[in-house]
Amino acid sequence: MTDALQIPRDLLPADGRFGAGPSKIQTAHLDALAATGSTLMGTSHRQAPVRDLVGRVRSGLAELFSLPDGYQVVLGNGGATAFWDIATYGLIQERSQHLTFGEFSSKFAKAAKAAPWLADPSVIASEPGSRPAPVAEDGVDAYAWAHNETSTAVMAPVVRPAGTSSDSSLVLVDATSGAGGLPVDLREVDVYYFAPQKCFASDGGLWIALFSPAALERAATVAASGRHIPAFFDLPTAIDNSAKNQTYNTPAVATLFLMAEQLDWMNASGGLDGMVARTTESSDTLYTWAEKSPYAFPYVTDPDHRSLVIGTIDFEDGIDAARVAAVLRANGVVDTEPYRKLGRNQLRIAMYPAVDPADVEALTRSIDWVVDHL
């Protein structure tokens, strides 16, 4: 059995969690959650302890992203997946353009196409492992793409399409796995939305979005247009509740707490620049190793497209990546398997800010050892 191989302990990472999400949660933050005892968990989300926690998350995000004047931090339940439907109800007026370059970026396009009150979206697609670019288009009032395609480990720039303006069209960026680990200038985007279980080292179930003034206005305009919007998807309700440091319905309090702890750590460790420096160090280590390896190579061929926060590494046909992942898992190095629908002979490795760059280097040494002993 290959999973019976014992990797020498001096080669192993100190922490073996490399999953793309749910991702590594710092144990100190779990200890801090336990230490709250009876003061937070199990108390009303309409009272000060939980509302103060929501405020802590919102202010932490404002600090991390240097929130421009007029922008607001809005949050609600359901995760980033729910936000695609929220956007079809409350942000797209008539027609959207979508960049699709993997499983998750394509899902928003499918949601827009399925909405009978919207015109069929414009879709610009590229093969997995590469990325397309947005193009100004008449009749489009929302441009949407992912900052980081989690399934393939391709990152895309966040730049407003040339020839467009927030006066007539919004830029909606799915930053689920990129926010907090990739650089961004929020002045280039109207809604930058994400979830806590990636760079923010928490659990899932919430969506968080940074809204520009134009996006806030659009949400109000669409809501007033007479379009039927289910209460759970109503953005003005979420915006109003968020301004009061609460959510429309009961949030996952532990998720908020772990995110707040991570935000405190991020802001105390150099802010967004410090986090990008961490993910850059980790990804440089991974890709340099793969480029020098006799049996592995980066799946994403263009270095400019390679993600800082997720790495996909292909293996030569003679090496079974699934067997490598199985041995790693048996040795406590977990969740390096590739995205299931991509169907590649590869490993997928998360390098979010909570992951120590030294552990990424140790992972490469462990992989080399496993391949040598298969």
Curated annotation (Swiss-Prot):
What is catalyzed by this enzyme? O-phospho-L-serine + 2-oxoglutarate = 3-phosphooxypyruvate + L-glutamate; 4-(phosphooxy)-L-threonine + 2-oxoglutarate = (R)-3-hydroxy-2-oxo-4-phosphooxybutanoate + L-glutamate
One cellular-component annotation, GO: cytoplasm
Q: Which SUPFAM superfamilies match?
A: PLP-dependent transferases
Q: Which InterPro entries match?
A: Aminotrans_V_dom (IPR000192), Pser_aminoTfrase (IPR022278), Pser_aminoTfrase_mycobac (IPR006272), PyrdxlP-dep_Trfase (IPR015424), PyrdxlP-dep_Trfase_major (IPR015421), PyrdxlP-dep_Trfase_small (IPR015422)
- Tell me the compartments it is located in: Cytoplasm
What gene is it encoded by? serC
Q: Which residues bind pyridoxal 5'-phosphate?
A: 80-81, 104, 150, 174, 197, 249-250
Give the record's cofactor note, including how many are bound: Binds 1 pyridoxal phosphate per subunit.
The name of this protein is: Phosphoserine aminotransferase
Q: Which domain of life is it from?
A: Bacteria
Q: Which cofactor does it need?
A: pyridoxal 5'-phosphate
Asked whether the UniProt record includes Oxidoreductase among its keywords, one would answer no
Q: In which pathway does it act?
A: Amino-acid biosynthesis; L-serine biosynthesis; L-serine from 3-phospho-D-glycerate: step 2/3; Cofactor biosynthesis; pyridoxine 5'-phosphate biosynthesis; pyridoxine 5'-phosphate from D-erythrose 4-phosphate: step 3/5
Q: What is its EC number?
A: 2.6.1.52
Establish whether keyword ATP-binding is in the entry. Answer: no
- The record's disulfide annotation reads none
Q: Please list the residues that carry the modification N6-(pyridoxal phosphate)lysine.
A: 198
Q: Where does L-glutamate bind?
A: 46
Subunit organization: Homodimer.
Task: Show the GO MF annotations.
Answer: alanine-glyoxylate transaminase activity; L-serine-pyruvate transaminase activity; O-phospho-L-serine:2-oxoglutarate aminotransferase activity; pyridoxal phosphate binding
Enzyme class, broadest EC rank:
transferase
